[in-house]
Amino acid sequence: MEQESLNGRYGSRVMTDEQMETLRKQIAIYAVLCDQLVFLHNSLSSVPLLSSGMNPMRGEYFDPMVASSSAHGMSTRPRWTPTTTQLQILENIYKEGSGTPNPRRIKEITMELSEHGQIMEKNVYHWFQNRRARSKRKQPPTTTITSSQADDAAVTTTEERGRCGDDSGGFESYEHILFPSPDLGIEHLLNRDKFID
């Protein structure tokens, strides 16, 4: 009867006392980590950075992961922090070239930058990748209209003006435009181009 009540229908235990204690410790550690992450997020969001990673207050390269991990006593892998001279050289090379340099050129750049501080080839490669991504993120999306598209639009507008009567104020020329129903979602508008082609 006692065996049945422990393992059967009347209150079987899923975890041992040892497992429960381990779970309690894990939950406590998780709570501490969450608190540290909230603190880290708040401290990082209050530091203004330029697009290149420069901290305008101190004029040096700011790496939030290095600054935050040392403040909290967490151990992370060492990260490369370029000197101001290295950053200037990298920015100049980026402005001269187009995109990420080839492996041979990365070796040359690394040799040049090593005169101004520690650096590895992968640091140079990643810097160019990140710099390109930052510049793409900053560019507003551009829509270009070719001259033939502009001419087509002008011809269509002229033809429509000829069809509409003077007494209507020109509103009949817009009857062919289909306005989407407010019930349709954004997906309808995004997929519209697929059906036009």
From Swiss-Prot:
The keyword Transcription regulation applies. Residues 132-168 are annotated as: Disordered. The keyword Nucleotide-binding does not apply. Belongs to the WUS homeobox family. Its main location: nucleus. SUPFAM superfamilies: Homeodomain-like. Residues 75-139 bind DNA. It comes from the Eukaryota. Potential transcription factor that plays a central role during developmental processes. PANTHER family: WUSCHEL-RELATED HOMEOBOX 10-RELATED (PTHR46777:SF14), WUSCHEL-RELATED HOMEOBOX 13 (PTHR46777). This is Putative WUSCHEL-related homeobox 10. SMART domains: HOX. It holds the Pfam family Homeodomain. It comes from Arabidopsis thaliana. One of its GO terms (cellular component) is nucleus. GO terms for molecular function: DNA binding; DNA-binding transcription factor activity. Keywords: Developmental protein, DNA-binding, Homeobox, Nucleus, Transcription, Transcription regulation. It is found in: Nucleus. Coiled coil: none annotated. Residues 140-150 have a biased composition (Polar residues). The gene is WOX10.
